Structures are given as structure tokens and as C-alpha cells.
Amino acid sequence: MAAPKRRTSKMKQRTRLAAQAWRAPKLRKCQNCGSSTPGHTACPNCGTYTTRSGKEIVVKAEA
């Protein structure tokens, strides 16, 4: 079994663990209503995704 030759320094440990740290999700403002939404998702308030209206797409799929 392999064993480490040197002790890992505190800086190496901290930089390695920094990649696992929790980060707040990045939000953007909706172009239509201005509410904050996560990226690459439809707006929960108005239902738009970029230029397309999500509510119209759902209604067409049901009909």
C-alpha cells in the first residue's frame, strides 16, 4: 500500500478543500419581469425562458 512521503502542508489541504466548499447559486434577472431566477431555467413568476414564453408552450402541448 502506498504511503505519503511528505506531510501535506496546510496550504495544500486548504486549496484542495476549497474546491468542495459550498457556493451560493448564481442568479440572473428575468428579461421580462425582472425577478431573480437561476440560469438556464424558466422564470417561476412569468414562465419565460430567454425570448420564449413557457406558459404558451405548456398550453400548446396540452391541447
Swiss-Prot record:
An example Gene Ontology molecular-function term: structural constituent of ribosome
Entry GO CC: large ribosomal subunit
One Pfam family from the record: Ribosomal_L32p
SUPFAM superfamilies given in the database record: Zn-binding ribosomal proteins
HAMAP family linked: Ribosomal_bL32
Gene (name only): rpmF
Name this polypeptide is given: Large ribosomal subunit protein bL32
Family: Belongs to the bacterial ribosomal protein bL32 family.
